Amino acid sequence: MAAAANSGSSLPLFDCPTWAGKPPPGLHLDVVKGDKLIEKLIIDEKKYYLFGRNPDLCDFTIDHQSCSRVHAALVYHKHLKRVFLIDLNSTHGTFLGHIRLEPHKPQQIPIDSTVSFGASTRAYTLREKPQTLPSAVKGDEKMGGEDDELKGLLGLPEEETELDNLTEFNTAHNKRISTLTIEEGNLDIQRPKRKRKNSRVTFSEDDEIINPEDVDPSVGRFRNMVQTAVVPVKKKRVEGPGSLVLEESGSRRMQNFAFSGGLYGGLPPTHSEAGSQPHGIHGTALIGGLPMPYPNLAPDVDLTPVVPSAVNMNPAPNPAVYNPEAVNEPKKKKYAKEAWPGKKPTPSLLI
């Protein structure tokens, strides 16, 4: 396999050596700047990893001006079970601790050793997979009381530094898994290209009528709002005096509706009022020699206009019998008995 070009006009190719193999799981680099741990780089998936400024050609990008585009290569030896670092003719060099490496010469990197690239202040420390089992307890005094505590730790390291190291490693491992899952999913799932069938504007020659009432005058504009109902009509009676009687009786009922007897229209006349004020037709009485209708205290509302009846100003003299006893007796009013709704007439309880 070939790598990309380095700085300068020459284009050296990195050929993967035949002794390169896949590293053991959990092998990683701790990236430290000063006293702060920045990140962990997992290096257990490939035979070799490239470092440099070119993000398209390198596995790990070094964002520093002193580094070359393809600066160095980290290779795992499958027979020696060791990691080797190769400088790819960089301008400012690759360092193992404070020792600068010779170009194109593999150099073994022991575990827990630190390397750096160019003038970058970031240090890369080679680490193995953190041990999840607790370290052996030294001394017979700690065996009794701390066994329960060690069981409660569930395989976590005792020291806080080791615990932080394990946490960072798990975080980097999970981040790599999520990245690989997304990349593999993008490779497997190919989005189908969207086909544009009707990308051009076409005009139809046929005219489509949306509102037929604008074209056809026989079609009504409000045809959807019209409802049709069939009402059967009774047969009319034969023309004759009988038909006139029905019409006259209906008109008389409408005319006599307004001239009801009123509140006291249904009361029988008293003995004193029988002779002096006889009732006329349709609730009228002679008051002061003039026929006047009783006032209706609760008239019904009728929407049809009622023609008022003409009052005769010169009535004919009423041949009523004059009774002098009725004049001297005091007049008494009679009130209608109130009828309770739902009350049934019961015989008097008094015997």
Curated annotation (Swiss-Prot):
Modified residues (Phosphothreonine): T161
Superkingdom in the source lineage: Eukaryota
Residue positions of motif Nuclear localization signal 2: 210-240
Subcellular location: Nucleus; Nucleus speckle
Signal peptide: none
Span of domain FHA: 49-101
Span list, region Disordered: 316-351
GO biological process, one term: mRNA processing
Pfam family, one: FHA
Residue positions, PTM Phosphotyrosine: Y264, Y335
Single GO cellular component term: nuclear speck
SUPFAM superfamilies: SMAD/FHA domain (SSF49879)
Predominant place of localization: nucleus
Region of interest: Interaction with CDC5L, SF3B1 and MELK: 1-142
UniProt region (Interaction with EED), positions on chain: 143-224, 310-329
Region (RNA-binding): 330-351
Region (Involved in PP-1 inhibition): 191-200, 331-337
Cysteine disulfide partners in this protein: none
SMART domains noted in UniProt: FHA
Residues the record marks as site: Not phosphorylated: T202, T346
UniProt cross-references to InterPro entries, sorted A to Z: Cell_Proc_Reg/RNA_Proc, FHA_dom, SMAD_FHA_dom_sf
Motif (Nuclear localization signal 1): 185-209
Domain statement: Has a basic N- and C-terminal and an acidic central domain. The FHA domain mediates interactions with threonine-phosphorylated MELK.
Functional description taken from the UniProt entry: Inhibitor subunit of the major nuclear protein phosphatase-1 (PP-1). It has RNA-binding activity but does not cleave RNA and may target PP-1 to RNA-associated substrates. May also be involved in pre-mRNA splicing. Binds DNA and might act as a transcriptional repressor. Seems to be required for cell proliferation.
Other comment: A synthetic peptide, NIPP-1(191-200), is able to inhibit PP-1. Alanine substitution of Val-201 and Phe-203 in NIPP-1(191-210) prevents PP-1 binding (far-western assay) but do not affect PP-1 inhibition. Phosphorylation of Ser-199 or Ser-204 prevents PP-1 binding (far-western assay) and reduces PP-1 inhibition.
Protein name: Nuclear inhibitor of protein phosphatase 1
